[in-house]
Amino acid sequence: MDIASLAFRTDLAMLEHSGSLVEHRETHLVVRTPDNPTYWWGNFLLLATAPADTGEVQGWLEAFEREFPDARHRTFGVDGTKGRRGDLAPFAEVGMDLDVSTVMTATAVHEPPRPNTDATYRRLESDADWQQQIALDLAGEEPATHDVDFVTARSEAERRLVAAGYGAWWGAFEDDRLLASMGLFTASPGLARFQNVKTHPDARGRGLAGTLVHRVSRYGFDDLGATTLVMVADPDYLAIRIYRSVGFADTERQLQAERKPSG
C-alpha cells in the first residue's frame, strides 16, 4: 500500500525510527509498538480508503481485534490528503470519535510577531531535562488520557530517536524550569517532522511556543538539511495561529477515528 498522506508518511517514519513495526497489507497497514501497547496511535490500522458504511466499519473493527486481541482501544487512520469529516461518518455512526487535523508545511520561516527573548532555548540533554519533559507532557492532561507509564514510555522512545541521530528535542527554559518543548526529526531525506509541541498551561500566551518553533525550524533547515518541515495541528485550537505566524501553511488534512478504552 502506497501512502499519499504526508502526515501519515511522517508519522510512520517517526514510529519506525523509534522501534515500531509497520506491516503492509493490500488494503491497509498494521502499525504496532510492542514497547508501548497502550499507545493508541502507535497501535492502529491505516486504511487505504474510508469505509463506505457501518457494515464495512464492523469488518475493520473485527480486523483490529484480530491484530490487537489485548487492546482496549480502537484506532483507525484513513489515507489521503483532502479528506473531510463526512468521509468518516460511518465511524461516527458506530459511536467512534472523529478527528480531522490540519497538515502544515514550511519551506522557510521567520520570527513570530512578538518573540520571547527572556527564556533560554536549548536541546534537552540530561536526565533531569527529560524528567521535566515527562512532567510537562502530563501538565494539564486528563490522567485517563495520558498516565505516567504511557508518557514515560513515549519519552523513552523520543530519547531513542535523539540517540539514533534523527534529530533533537528542544525546550524553552526559565531559571532551569522547562516551560515549552517540541521535537524535530528527519523523516526522510529533505523532510523533517515536528513532534508533540507542548507549552505548560501556566506559561501560555508569552510567545514561548512561537519563538521555539522558529528556532527549532532553523535547526531543521541548517542542521538536519531539511527542505520541508511538517507540522500537524488541531484546526480549532489557538496553536495553529502560532504556527502560521512563523511561516507554516495549511497543506493537507489527516483523518482519524478512535474509540477510547471504556471504564
In which residue ranges do the predicted regions lie?
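Conserved GNAT acetyl-CoA-binding A-motif
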Residues: 69-80, 220-232
